[in-house]
Amino acid sequence: MTKWFNVGKIVNTHGVKGEIRVVSRTDFPEERYKVGNTLYISNEKGGEPFPVKITSHRQHKTFDLLTFEGYGNVNEVEQFKGSLLKVPEDQLGELAEGEYYYHEIIGCNVVTEEGEALGTIKEVLSPGANDVWVIKRPKGQDLLIPYIDDVVLQVNIENKLVTIHVMEGLL
């Protein structure tokens, strides 16, 4: 069974020539929305995502505007409002060393450099300069860990284990 990943959400149409307005969920919109690439539309009703080929991409304000082959006017794309744009796992590109997809990080166990278990990563936030990992602790409130070299010492995706240095005031 194919594992699918969201890269955007179709929130509206734009104009009358079949453009759709997308709120992007990818860090690589220029690469992901390149003309000729295939994305998959998954509608709100469920079912298997179906392929669409990108014929144009441009940015407008905070949105990405896309058109698809075979969908040349607003009436043809109106049905896609609220749908998700997805890619199969085999279309995920290789990342540089020290970079990870969210789905690789979420679910990893977090330990201190002394070996004390802190919890499991349940969410990744992107508030600004660096990502923040939300750690679900066995007891008490969630813990927020900044993804910076001074704190995150080692990430082992294969073993789903992250080792951190606890800076003063972090816990």
Swiss-Prot record:
Coiled coil: none annotated. Signal peptide: none annotated. One of its GO terms (cellular component) is cytoplasm. Residues 97-170 form the PRC barrel domain. One of its GO terms (molecular function) is ribosome binding. InterPro entries: PRC-brl_dom, PRC_barrel-like_sf, RimM, RimM_N, RimM_N_sf, Transl_B-barrel_sf. It is found in: Cytoplasm. GO terms for biological process: ribosomal small subunit biogenesis; rRNA processing. Keywords: Chaperone, Cytoplasm, Ribosome biogenesis, rRNA processing. The keyword Cytoplasm applies. Binds ribosomal protein uS19. Belongs to the RimM family. An accessory protein needed during the final step in the assembly of 30S ribosomal subunit, possibly for assembly of the head region. Essential for efficient processing of 16S rRNA. May be needed both before and after RbfA during the maturation of 16S rRNA. It has affinity for free ribosomal 30S subunits but not for 70S ribosomes. The PRC barrel domain binds ribosomal protein uS19. This is Ribosome maturation factor RimM. The gene is rimM.
